[in-house]
Amino acid sequence: LKKFSDTGERLPVIGMGTWITFNVGNIIQTRNQRTQVLGTFFKLGGGLVDSSPMYGSAEEVLGYALDRLGRPQPSLFSATKVWTPFPSRGEWQIEESHKLWGLQQFDLYQIHNLVAWEHHLQTLQQHKQEGTIRYIGVTTSHGRRHQELEQIIQTQPIDFVQLTYNILDREVERRLLPAAIEKGVAVIANRPF
């Protein structure tokens, strides 16, 4: 487990992303297989599960799996994203994600690939104050917009950043990781392999 905030809260260092793998539609047999995968993940100490409205049916399948595994799952650290260029749709996506997952509170809500981040950050801050979100994050991948992401880390009240980091793509080591360390922002590596 790794400490990630001033609260002393800890998370396993390996999480589960749901892009492609949980976008299985309404096929019950496949949904049940994903439920088994999620159950095994929790049983073996996993916690962070990351999704997005961009991932097709993934959030709906997660809600299905969580219903069958029993609620609450004590080790679940729920993470999803808002992903729309239209500020008015952001609030709808947030409400829809709560319904699909069957959660009243998300542990982490992120702005996907910095899309309309200025507006969505305000919306997420309001939700954090209301208690429907515990932590706020921003994401990017494939080395895009690193300069902008660094500025956000340095100037905005965020708790997490999610970015591409692996043996072949180590660009973030130069500026983004040091900025996150300096500001106390937790880092989630996507595409680690």
Residue spans for each PLM region:
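Conserved, mostly hydrophobic/aromatic
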Residues: 4, 16, 41, 49, ...
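Acidic (Asp/Glu)-rich catalytic clusters
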Residues: 5-11, 63-75, 94-104, 124-130, ...
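Short, acidic/polar
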Residues: 26-42, 86-102, 119, 143-153
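Active-site mouth loops of central-metabolism enzymes
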Residues: 19-32, 79-88, 113, 139
